[in-house]
Amino acid sequence: VAENYSEKLLEVKRRGHEIAALGYRHENMALLTDEEQEAVMKKSIEAIKKICGDPPRGFRSPEGELTLETLRIAKKYGIEYSSNLCDDDRPYFKDLGQGETLLEIPIHWANYDLPYFAFNYHPAFPAGQGRIAGYEGVLSNWKDEFYGCREYGLCYVLQLDPAVIGAPGRISLLEDLLDYMKEQGDVWFARGSEMTNFYGN
């Protein structure tokens, strides 16, 4: 993606967003050997650095498929945080073994746009398989999840796929959610790298 859409990548960076790594060709890291994972990680980081000038500080594995070795390799290549696991509600330092840790910024399926909008089997298989969700229901879910995280001092991570949320009818969901979050007044909209700085990785 970085090499094919370098101008768009630079525009995203210019607008103040962080560029993190996500494999090279959307590889399932869990199915690769350690050597293959290392080659993918290296190629991904080099592609981003070549275009953006700086290496990425964060990594999210395509579809969340990874192994502990994936995180070790990411750390080896200078990655400072991961945002892959669904095992906590606050950032924490993932034990990589041998005294090594990596900041994990956990995600949750309820805050991911893909399951709501990308799956639509016809006929329904298995029986009762959900259809693409209604927009108002998704917005309500995301607001409720945010409210709960804010109420208990947790970390709300919204995971978005540009091809999913970027559809003309869906982008307004994100705008409405951001407006709602901003209205709360005491919310920190942080990049992963800012969280890494805060936690002192």
Annotate each predicted stretch with a short phrase.
Residues 1-58, 63-112, 136-158, 166-201:
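Catalytic alpha-helical scaffold of carbohydrate-active enzymes acting on polysaccharides/glycoconjugates
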Residues 103-128:
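Glycine-rich, positively charged active-site loop/lid region within alpha/beta enzyme cores that binds
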Residues 55-56, 121-135, 162-163:
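Surface-exposed cleft-lining segments at the edges of enzyme active sites
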